[in-house]
């Protein structure tokens, strides 16, 4: 516990909250252009080929974003919308690509949880 004299000398510093998605610059989503689309393997207990894209955002950041869902049409120079949200078993992947917007089409033949994968209601 500081003394009154110590508090006069230097005041208490407010706790700064660190953002988990700094590249979005406080925006809910950001537009970006894919510079590379590739697959990476997840951390230890899991095994797969996860689809990711290197994206250059309008904020100037170059980030790695996960492409959710089965199958995708994203390639180099595709314009995509990026939201925050990390992938737990992929270190360094802190963003998701939003399916069903801009150049990223929705997941084909998706019946449940459609809104998360940009799929319209089937007729």
From Swiss-Prot:
SUPFAM superfamilies: Nucleic acid-binding proteins. InterPro entries: NA-bd_OB-fold, Ribosomal_uS12, Ribosomal_uS12_bac. The keyword Chloroplast applies. The keyword Nucleus does not apply. GO terms for cellular component: chloroplast; ribosome; small ribosomal subunit. It is found in: Plastid, Chloroplast. It comes from the Eukaryota. Its main location: plastid. Keywords: Chloroplast, Plastid, Ribonucleoprotein, Ribosomal protein, RNA-binding, rRNA-binding. Gene3D superfamilies: Nucleic acid-binding proteins (2.40.50.140). GO terms for molecular function: rRNA binding; structural constituent of ribosome. GO terms for biological process: translation. CDD domains: Ribosomal_S12. Part of the 30S ribosomal subunit. With S4 and S5 plays an important role in translational accuracy. Located at the interface of the 30S and 50S subunits. Belongs to the universal ribosomal protein uS12 family. This is Small ribosomal subunit protein uS12cz/uS12cy. It comes from Vitis vinifera (Grape).
């Amino acid at each position: 516990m500081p003394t009154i004299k110590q508090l006069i000398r230097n005041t208490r510093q407010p706790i700064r909250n660190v953002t988990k998605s700094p590249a979005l610059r406080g925006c809910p989503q950001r537009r970006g252009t894919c510079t590379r689309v590739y697959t990476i393997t997840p951390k230890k207990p899991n095994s797969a080929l996860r689809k990711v894209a290197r994206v250059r955002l309008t904020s100037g950041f170059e980030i790695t974003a996960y492409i959710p869902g089965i199958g995708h049409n994203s390639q180099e120079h595709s314009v995509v919308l990026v939201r925050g949200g990390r992938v737990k078993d992929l270190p360094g992947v802190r963003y998701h690509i939003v399916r069903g917007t801009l150049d990223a089409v929705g997941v084909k033949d998706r019946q449940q949880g459609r809104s998360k994968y940009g799929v319209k209601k089937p007729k």
